[in-house]
Amino acid sequence: MNFNFSRFQYISNIFFILIISFPGGLIYLLTGSTLSFWLRESGFDKITIGLFSLVNFIHIFKFLWGPLLEKVSFAPLSKRGYKYCLIIALVSCICCVYILTNFNPNTHFIPFALCLVAVAFFSSIYDMLLQSSQMLLITNKNWGISEAACTTGFRIGILIAGSGALYLSTIISWQDVYRSMAILCIPSLLLIIIYPLKFKDKTIINDFDRFWYAFYDFIKKPKWLIIVSFMLLYRLQDNFLSIMPNMFYLDIGYTKKDLALGYKAFGMCAAILGGFIGGFLCRKYEYFYLLKRALIYHALSSLSFLFLYFYNRDITSLYIAVFFQEFTKGLTMSPFFSYQLRCCSSKYCITQIALITSIAYISTILFGSISGYAATYLGWTYFFLVAGFCFIPAYILIKYLPPYVIPS
């Protein structure tokens, strides 16, 4: 039997993407949802907790240093330069998380916040490199699968930093929880160090003396303003909800252990399942069909919050509601991220992916920062009703998107 080296390379690259995606999800939650529980137990109100999402504002501007990172990553060190950038970004994230644990948010508010911003900064660099790895290592026909792998690794990181951290917080201090989370990133770091990178297109690592053309290349694409608007609005529902579901579940009587198992662990499994199904469906159906259906299903999931609020608050109902919410969320992500990759040119992948994800992050920061105000002044009923209608702008824009923006 002949050994199929190309298939082995493809599978190993998928596995590599999955493993290095783990720290991305873990660190993402440490500055988001998990942080909200720490702040809540430290005595902060919903409005202040919502405003803490502004620490991730740095993600909005990552496209500004994307070209510099692109030049450093690929020339003159080529694959080694790319690997060095991954290592430096991840090591910096780990160190900043560890430094964060030396501060109490009540007594050392400013240094605590500054450390969070530093974590977000290095996390944004790591995310850019992580997302571009799919374009560098995987052929475009398999981006749906690679995105499912990336989402799975990311979601596992979220699971550990969510369910695992929440459960640990009932046993040890939040400072020790965050130290434990930082240590868990080390296996991914070791894999990055030892894994032999093999880019599918060697032209990617040549001649970036005029890297600013990445922006010009993007605005030459058909209907680029509609693409930008779509990236801004697609995740409007999730961004509006932000970290408020954490507060909602606590307010209606669920304990941290209930949420660790039901909301975080079970919900993450549902999201991973949705992500994989979405990834495989990308190979069978066109993107716009999936994007529309996923948006509608996910919008309906807002009703599950109201079901818990008005009718039933037992554990079984929590699991049903969480499955609906998280499965549909996972279903929306694979076609969305895969379409993002199709909007980028391979030779400018880091800069253009940074630009697109920065645009998407504007919505995350803007609506996440006001979610606390909205939940406080609207009340839970109207808050979740408004969230349910947030899919409409993106749904309308899908009709006007260019069908396929194939990377050059």
From Swiss-Prot:
Cite a single Pfam family from the UniProt record: MFS_1
Q: How does it sit in the membrane?
A: Multi-pass membrane protein
Q: Which GO terms describe its molecular function?
A: transmembrane transporter activity
Swiss-Prot/TrEMBL keywords: Cell inner membrane, Cell membrane, Membrane, Transmembrane, Transmembrane helix, Transport
Could you tell me which InterPro entries the record lists for this protein? AmpG_permease/AT-1, MFS, MFS_trans_sf
Protein location: Cell inner membrane
One Gene Ontology CC term in the entry: plasma membrane
Residue spans making up a coiled coil are: none
Superkingdom of this entry's organism? Bacteria
Which residue ranges traverse the bilayer?
10-30, 49-69, 84-104, 109-129, 154-174, 177-197, 224-244, 261-281, 294-311, 315-337, 353-373, 378-398
Q: Which PANTHER family match?
A: MAJOR FACILITATOR SUPERFAMILY DOMAIN-CONTAINING PROTEIN 3 (PTHR12778:SF10), SOLUTE CARRIER FAMILY 33 ACETYL-COA TRANSPORTER -RELATED (PTHR12778)
Query: Family assignment?
Result: Belongs to the major facilitator superfamily.
Q: What protein name does the entry list? A: Putative transporter AmpG 2
- Originating gene: ampG2
